[in-house]
Amino acid sequence: MDFGVIFLSHVESYKEAAFAEAKGFTHAWFGDSQMVWADVYQCMALCASKTTTIKLGTNVTNPSSRIAPVTACNFATLNMLAPGRVIMGIGTGNTSRRTLGMPAAKLAELRTHVEVCRGLLSGATVPYQEGERRRMIKFLNPDSGLINLKNPVPIYVAGSGPKTLELAGEIGDGVILFGTVGDSLLGYTLSHIRRGAERAGKRLEDLYVLVLTAFHLTKPGESLATLQQAVGPLVTSECNIFALSVTNPDELPGDIRDDLMAFKNAYRTPNAPIETRHLDLYTGYCAEFKPEHTPLVTERMIKETTLTGTPEEIRARIRKMQAMGVKQVAVAGGVPEITEFATHVIQELG
């Protein structure tokens, strides 16, 4: 089992990434949401220059913020700084789009973006289209020492909804899941990933599946309010994404369907002007717990979507996730969480 740490991209992420590397973490993941955090590629470049072994990935980029040749160039450049340590994590762009008041990218756009980037990063000449104009493109100076196309850059596709999960299984080298800690939610996502993988002649076991989530060690008598402050921001984000990712709620696991769908409007104020309502809804996203989310973030949903509990409970849950097919768990946090996770999980399970 590999272990990762999740950062809300900032220019000093390299300090925590280097600390995590020293503590035995294998991966570091950086949020890409231009209206919320710092620029992901600048933060990753700093981390690449300050670390030696930890792998660095986007969590996650998308097809809309940048055209595919720019995305590919970013990763080819990072691959010069950290050869063989770079991973492209990509999805449809939930917050990076919704913080603009825009919808997430379409699956066809995601597929095309991945295909163009994969081709360019392998040194191929690939078709590229804007509107009705279709041209062939390639990196023109691959051996100039400006970019690195020699070390492979794996592409992991993020998903929560059935169709996106199946596409991830079909076209991804790996799949990124959010908050799929409990058996029913993890089993639901893996079944769709398997379906997509089989469509491409692959097995689920061929894919690198990782779960990004929150982590909190509980203390005796700890209140629900304390847990909500600790992991509530990520619980709300993860569950909201699941609720928005289905066209028919019946597609979700029956035992937690209603709990998940309750998060559908977590970041929506129906009475606010449509032109500006998104400006307030995502302030403090994934970092601050908002009072209006208190009724939604129950003990049950905390257990279903995060690694919250005693050290023994968390280790047992990770073992179960590994048995089901997960190859990495990545947790959000700074130095205190990194230290606790390294002490109570990595040293015991690694």
Can you annotate each of these PLM segments?
Residues M1-N59, V153:
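N-terminal beta1-alpha1-beta2 module of alpha/beta enzyme domains
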Residues Y41-T61, H113, L120, T343-G350:
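Alpha-helix-loop-beta-strand connector modules within alpha/beta enzyme cores
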